[in-house]
Amino acid sequence: MSSVLMSKTVTPFLREHIPSIYAPIGKPGNQETARAENPNSKYCYRHHPDSKCRRAADKAKMVMIQSELDKLTSADQQAVTHVWSLFSAAPARHRDLMLQGILSQLCFPQLSFVSREVNEALKIDFISALPVELAQKVLCYLDTVSLTKAAQVSQRWRTLADSDAVWVRMCEQHVNRKCTKCGWGLPLLERKKLRNYTRQRQLAKGGPQGRVTELADSHDSQDRSVNQHGKRPAAEAEEEDPIKKRQCMAAAEASKAVTQPKTRSWKAVYRDRWQVSYNWKNSRYKLSVLKGHENGVTCLQLDDNILATGSYDTTIKIWNIETEECIRTLVGHTAGIRALQFDDSKLISGSLDHTIKVWNWHTGECLSTFAAHTDSVISVHFDGHLLASGSSDKTVKIFDFNSKETYCLKGHSDWVNSTHVDIKSRTVFSASDDTTIKLWDLDTRQVIRTYEGHVGHVQQVLILPPEYEPDEEVLNGASQDNQDAMSVSSGGSGSPSMSHAQIERAGSPGSHSSSHNLLPSSLPSGDEDVRHLYGSAFVADESRPLPPRYFMTGGLDSTMRLWDSATGRCLRTLFGHLEGVWSLAGDTIRVISGANDGMVKTWEPRSGKCDATYTGHCGPVTCVGLSDSLMASGSEDGTIRLHSFKPCRQ
């Protein structure tokens, strides 16, 4: 192309369009008119100088292009450069026209080359380009593996992927619950750390006599020498020596600096819990065997760093889990210990000597003894100011520590092996050798419902947390089975509906429930329907909390059963143990069971799947305990096996 021809064709084109490219300010007048007359007077979103999608030129590619261009003759270099200049200066409509013409002339190898180049050019960093709030919203949909990979892309991605706004959502979805999407559930550790901190503060304050009278929330209590405003009385402050006063202030500041909790990111919170959950899922644990009892271990309770065990040797031992040492032995019963429970200040035990004792487990002192039963005490459970005990005399005794009242609940025809008080709803669950479980109303002292289904002695009743919800397929399957049963019993009418009067009778005190006489699961959808199922006492007082909805039981028929306390339905039966189930423990994430076959099993409570089986005991496993990162089991072989799922660094 001659210079004359070039000046006649290329120069006018560039003269017309280049100013709008390098000075895209827009023409005066109406904005829409200016945009229509000057379509390239505004930057596109990709080439706008402020756009985060705009990438710097690829240095390697530019060097390669320059190298290839240098290989051409001067005329060819000028021609190629003019093509680039024309395309660069062309408006959007002209560019589209140029590209269509060029693409229509390309052969397949050239089309493949264009496809590869376009594929790379279309990739933009949309996370960095989006506003922070939208980018975090997008990242909230990723799982943990994808999030950790996203944090490795760039510093910008790492800042967004590690932000608290993303990981707090992840914690809400997994901590203290089972995620319905991925199946992972993470333990709630902070509550236990708070208790440990409270206990350490109590130990540092003074002797054990003062600790007995403190409540579980004693970390909120104030020093007696400090008034409501956090100040000492003026007279007392004036009497203090100035030097001593400065020393006290310095010590207080140092103590405050040490004890003040550090702020942690939500990602770190999630990581700590994920490590514990990973160890549970893969059965990675540290095993400790505690020996000290001279006979079989019958009961235990695990709480943070303290383990309490009872035995047929008539003693109760208090263990320090970290040091694996017995720090105290409680002696006073004259026969084997069958049940115990403790909190921060007291321990209550039930024995074969027909008595219940209240201990100060910090000192080993027996504070009081109750001789309310006429036979062996098999179970004890307290909640607040109420204590329930079950005995081989076939009765349940209720002790009210506030009113000093004691009364008896009669209805079982055999030993009462397990009791559980729910102080909010003022109800008690009891399990018996007569193969039934009963729900009692403490206001009327009558049976609300009797649950039938086990064919062997029922040894344990485990109340599931309020957050627990069974799988929908469990509810749907149970509902379908129940509807079929009702259709048959109604002469094939096919109508599963029940009248209001039937609901009243089904929820009345003393009613029986079994797998063949159940209420449809579609009924208790609202609070009013559920209240009718628990009887007239709950209907009359709408402010009264309802009893726990779901619970599990273990029996000597080698099965565990999941129950709906409102309908009386057995929702699921868990099989796996070869011999009778003696003990259960659980939380929102897992349930563990100990049986006469010497095995401990962990279960997923929603699906009913057995996650793992632990062996090692040389006798029946009579008791189990569970915390977020620990599992304890006691056996008639006289040992306690402690499984710690804490990360090694802890």
UniProtKB/Swiss-Prot annotation:
Changing D143I: Leads to constitutive sulfur system repression. CDD domains: F-box_SpPof1-like, WD40. Residues 487-499, 507-525 have a biased composition (Low complexity). Keywords: Repeat, Transcription, Transcription regulation, Ubl conjugation pathway, WD repeat. WD repeats lie at residues 292-320, 332-360, 372-400, 411-441, 453-488, 528-564, 576-604, 616-644. GO terms for cellular component: nuclear SCF ubiquitin ligase complex; nucleus. Signal peptide: none annotated. Pathway: Protein modification; protein ubiquitination. Residues 200-244, 482-525 are annotated as: Disordered. The keyword NAD does not apply. InterPro entries: F-box-like_dom_sf (IPR036047), F-box_dom (IPR001810), G-protein_beta_WD-40_rep (IPR020472), Quinoprotein_ADH-like_sf (IPR011047), SCF_subunit_WD-repeat (IPR051075), WD40/YVTN_repeat-like_dom_sf (IPR015943), WD40_repeat_CS (IPR019775), WD40_rpt (IPR001680). Residues 214-223 have a biased composition (Basic and acidic residues). Pfam families: F-box-like, WD40. The keyword Translocase does not apply. Belongs to the WD repeat MET30/SCONB/SCON-2 family. Component of the SCF(scon-2) E3 ubiquitin ligase complex involved in the regulation of sulfur metabolite repression, probably by mediating the inactivation or degradation of the metR transcription factor. This is Probable E3 ubiquitin ligase complex SCF subunit scon-2. The gene is scon-2.
